[in-house]
């Protein structure tokens, strides 16, 4: 999904009126937002943080210094690790790492829903939608997290719902 489409989804989920126009610059199509009263903003996470502040929902950026750092870490991860990686091996490595990380967490920061969850959900959607039932079970923690985020009010919108089976079909023993 193009960054402009993600930012439009984010705007809608934040309850903002669709007044922003996005363009893309460079070979990698980095999103650009021209603000009404200042310089243009460049980059998915920069623009997303601006939209969160515009919607007066700063809690999505983290409530403590540690949580803010974790949100920033996962936003950076989204841009550096998820975007631009489309080989099946890259994605499975990413899902394996994320699965381990989410083992004891509800959300990326632990117990609070943040912008990092939203943007990572949008970034992973195109990959998760193509996983087999067996792959979804292999990455059980990612599947749990993803299913939880897609059912969070206002997040999924027009994106296809990914079906997860509640009872495991496969066991880890071979």
UniProtKB/Swiss-Prot annotation:
Keywords associated with the record: Acetylation, Coiled coil, Cytoplasm, Nucleus, Protein biosynthesis
Residue stretches making up the GST C-terminal domain: 50-173
UniProt xrefs under CDD domains: GST_C_AIMP3 (cd10305)
Effect upon mutating residue 73 to R: Disrupts interaction with MARS1
Modified residues (N-acetylalanine): 2
One record GO biological process: positive regulation of apoptotic process
Segments for region (N-terminal): 2-56
Parts forming coiled coils: 153-169
Induction info: By DNA damaging agents such as UV, adriamycin, actinomycin-D and cisplatin.
Consequence of changing residue 144 to A: Disrupts interaction with EPRS1
Subunit structure: Part of a multisubunit complex that groups tRNA ligases for Arg (RARS1), Asp (DARS1), Gln (QARS1), Ile (IARS1), Leu (LARS1), Lys (KARS1), Met (MARS1) the bifunctional ligase for Glu and Pro (EPRS1) and the auxiliary subunits AIMP1/p43, AIMP2/p38 and EEF1E1/p18. Can interact simultaneously with MARS1 and EPRS1. Forms a linear complex that contains MARS1, EEF1E1, EPRS1 and AIMP2 that is at the core of the multisubunit complex. Interacts with ATM and ATR.
Its job: Positive modulator of ATM response to DNA damage.
Annotated protein name in UniProt: Eukaryotic translation elongation factor 1 epsilon-1
Originating gene: EEF1E1
